[in-house]
Amino acid sequence: TLSILFIIILSFYEINKQKKNNLISEKYIEAGLYLASNDLEKSKILYEQIIFSKNPFYSTLALNTILEKDLEKDSSKILKYFEIIEKIINQKEQNDILNLKKALYLIKNSDEQTGYEILKELRDSNSSLKSIAEEILKD
């Protein structure tokens, strides 16, 4: 009976996790539709909600869209988004990509020194992005 209870709890957990993922994916699609119809404020709000949901896949996509479409002007908010996503990513390669984006964002917008420090860390680590970081540091 204990094993049956465990299986039921595990099944419930997986179903709940899948439902949450589906809701976030629907929200991501909705944000994209708002963006396509040029309703930037509604799309930004939905992308922020996705980031705060802490879904590793969709939060990263939402941040990428916010950065690419320049939906958020407040750099402190953008840095907060980076912090949230840094805490939920557990693969080194994804974390390196996020750090590269953060470095480029900082160099472009607010804090060149910190951006270059992040690039130096990527260069000095065993990152697959080492050559890209070196190339940017040369310029």
Predicted segments, located by residue:
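Alpha-helix N-cap/N′ positions at the starts of helices
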Residues: 19-26, 42, 98
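A short, mixed-charge helix-start or loop-turn motif at secondary-structure junctions
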Residues: 13, 49, 84-85
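TPR-adjacent "capping" and linker segments in tetratricopeptide-repeat scaffold/adaptor proteins
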Residues: 12-24, 89
